Amino acid sequence: MYDYLIVTHIPAFYKINLYNELAKRLKIFVIFISSDTSQKRSNNFSSVNDALFDYEVLYKGDFQKRKIFKNILAIQTILSRVKFKKILVSGWDLPEFWYIAFTSKKSKNCLALESTIFESSYKGLKGFIKKIFLSRISTVFASGSLHCDLLKALNFQGEVKVTNGVGIINKPEFIKTQKKFSGRFLYIGRIVDIKNLKFLVEIFNAMPNFTLTIIGVGEQQEFLQSISNKNIIFRGAIENKFIGAEFAKNDVFILPSLIEPWGLVVEEALYFGLPVLISDRCGSSELIKNGINGFIFDPTDKNRLMQIIRNFDDEILQNLCSNADSYDINAKDTQQISVYL
């Protein structure tokens, strides 16, 4: 019998890393809805090649092209033959998750909540629908404090466990060097509207002495390139194994999102020793302490972010980098794993 039957969207690298660690302590079986997605930052974002646990992939292809009814039938077959103590679904956004919530016993049903109070409606019809889903859930594994705020707003009465993360990043070895401020800022992620990159481009257009490098692809890329000055560099998608080199080339990481359920790239930036400027709408903003390892800003306030950027110098950067270096990512990951035990 499995301790957990986990059902999640795709085999993203950070989920594979988390499940591999869980599999050292627990017996788990993972159902991946699809093998890949068209919405990702790099070509090697998802793969089951490194999986060290039992799993099944329902659809071999992009998540957006999957056959939902066929997936539900496959889930029905798996549930009839696999014995488990708990079943953990990774959201309430898919028909597959709703099928599981209403066909499995409530006492076994768990939810991994990666939505925050900022991007998920809790009032009106949408809030009512979420409450119906939660009525079938006994335990919620909430990523952080903004996720717990959403549960409170939805009046969830079940058990809540806080994971302080959504997965485990890759941790390649690298040589740490002391940085001198060179005015180089970095963004890594999808180039879509909710990431608020037009806001960032307009700021750096007005600050030609600073450089912004944007890594990723998305529907806004062509438009943003057309309005960007020469101090804004678009690099396209870069494989995960080369991400460390990009952090090394830059001084500060920026995540300006209007909506960001977590923001795993913030953990990557801290791991590689970069301070982080982060929107207060991001779930992982709780990892950043103002003036210690970065700064938190309002993603609609250009003047405030411009002031933060202009204030950077060698001394401020080195102090922030020193604190970013001292961030214990392994301790955070150990705590995340322990929540499931």
Short names for language-model regions:
Residues 95, 109-125, 136-139:
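A short, histidine- and acid-enriched strand-loop-helix "catalytic/donor-clamping" loop
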Residues 135-175, 180:
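Donor nucleotide-sugar binding/catalytic pocket of nucleotide-sugar-dependent glycosyltransferases
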Residues 177-195, 201-207, 212:
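Conserved donor-binding/catalytic core segment of Leloir-type glycosyltransferases
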Residues 222-241:
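Nucleotide-activated donor-binding/catalytic signature segment of Leloir-type glycosyltransferases, i.e.
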Residues 258:
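Aromatic "clamp/platform" in nucleotide-sugar-dependent glycosyltransferases that forms part
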Residues 275-278:
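Short hydrophobic beta-strand element within catalytic cores of glycosyltransferases
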Residues 290-291, 295-302, 309-315:
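Conserved acidic donor-binding segment of nucleotide-sugar-dependent glycosyltransferases
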Residues 316-341:
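A charged, aromatic-enriched C-terminal amphipathic alpha-helix characteristic of glycosyltransferases
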